[in-house]
Amino acid sequence: MNLLPTPESPVTRQEKMATVWDEAEQDGIGEEVLKMSTEEIVQRTRLLDSEIKIMKSEVLRVTHELQAMKDKIKENSEKIKVNKTLPYLVSNVIELLDVDPNDQEEDGANIDLDSQRKGKCAVIKTSTRQTYFLPVIGLVDAEKLKPGDLVGVNKDSYLILETLPTEYDSRVKAMEVDERPTEQYSDIGGLDKQIQELVEAIVLPMNHKEKFENLGIQPPKGVLMYGPPGTGKTLLARACAAQTKATFLKLAGPQLVQMFIGDGAKLVRDAFALAKEKAPSIIFIDELDAIGTKRFDSEKAGDREVQRTMLELLNQLDGFQPNTQVKVIAATNRVDILDPALLRSGRLDRKIEFPMPNEEARARIMQIHSRKMNVSPDVNYEELARCTDDFNGAQCKAVCVEAGMIALRRGATELTHEDYMEGILEVQAKKKANLQYYA
């Protein structure tokens, strides 16, 4: 029996070599490795093992450094949180400066810190009347700051920690009407023309600004409502505030007359600044004649202060652009004593007169104020309107109230025509014989 191995043919050996090369290529083993001897491969393997150990130690070191950095960041975040819970020192930003990185380094210093800074620096003035230069602004983005901003700074490092809301006079904040009036245009009788003029001048530019832009016209800056007392000026302003979603600021003319010099002018400035911040907004100035009287020579300090307040109002009326969402409504019953500078075009452009109601308007007013009452069907409002000659809107409402009180006094369940007639007599008895509204 022959146990000797049979010699392989050259073709079989070549096929095996080709198979080995194919498997090496599939495994990613290069031709260089295949040509290496066993000792060289062992040596190469040891080198790779040592490199792997070095890389593992490097990864471990970087992991420890990362954990240390995370701990440091957490510690610094806790410190920042503690600093932000401490009381702030209120300051004002006076100026923002750009640092030029191309400035030459200062002599005599190994490292010039000023030349390495980039970005913005700030100059602030604290509430203790001290001015500081901040090379590093702090935790607030420098792009969001502007001169005049109110900021809170750390009392030790003076770094800016947070921006504070703009400060306004507390009296101006109280002028903002929080609760919307409930009046509607349908609650106003006999003033259809005045309602249309007010809507065109105030409401349309705020709600449909594109209509004015398409025509290329500028809407009026403000409206002056004038007429005798009791004709519905303040009522129409309240209805306008109820129908628009704008912020409504109500100023009374006597509020702007203050004892200290410049106090009234500051109130006017703060009111317009608050209106601009909360735009769209409407500023209603009632009793404008308290500060808008004609200027005259006077040695009294009080008269000069009133004139200063009016000049500030003129400045604010000229100051804001007509396309902004801030509108002014002024009301007075003494238009004859107002300063001509207030009445010129470009300030209070639209002037709306509120005359005494005619017979039809008086009937409509009494119907409006009687619609919630239990009224008898035989009440003739046209006859009541003829009997209330020279009555204004407020007196027509007083007639309805007096009629209700008379019916209540006699224990009735509904109001009759005679109750209204007695109410007219009651109001006429209280009315002065000679009531002059204009000089």
UniProtKB/Swiss-Prot annotation:
Cell compartment(s), UniProt: Cytoplasm; Nucleus
Gene Ontology cellular-component annotations: nucleus; P-body; perinuclear region of cytoplasm; proteasome accessory complex; proteasome complex; proteasome regulatory particle, base subcomplex
Protein species of origin: Rattus norvegicus (Rat)
One Pfam match: Prot_ATP_ID_OB_C
Job description of the protein: Component of the 26S proteasome, a multiprotein complex involved in the ATP-dependent degradation of ubiquitinated proteins. This complex plays a key role in the maintenance of protein homeostasis by removing misfolded or damaged proteins, which could impair cellular functions, and by removing proteins whose functions are no longer required. Therefore, the proteasome participates in numerous cellular processes, including cell cycle progression, apoptosis, or DNA damage repair.
Record keywords: Acetylation, ATP-binding, Cytoplasm, Nucleotide-binding, Nucleus, Phosphoprotein, Proteasome
Sequence positions bearing Phosphoserine: S9, S376
Residues recorded with modification N-acetylmethionine: M1
Major localisation: cytoplasm
Family of the protein in this entry: Belongs to the AAA ATPase family.
Protein name listed in UniProt: 26S proteasome regulatory subunit 6A
Residues holding ATP: G227, P228, P229, G230, T231, G232, K233, T234
SUPFAM superfamilies from the UniProt entry: P-loop containing nucleoside triphosphate hydrolases (SSF52540)
Example GO molecular function: ATP hydrolysis activity
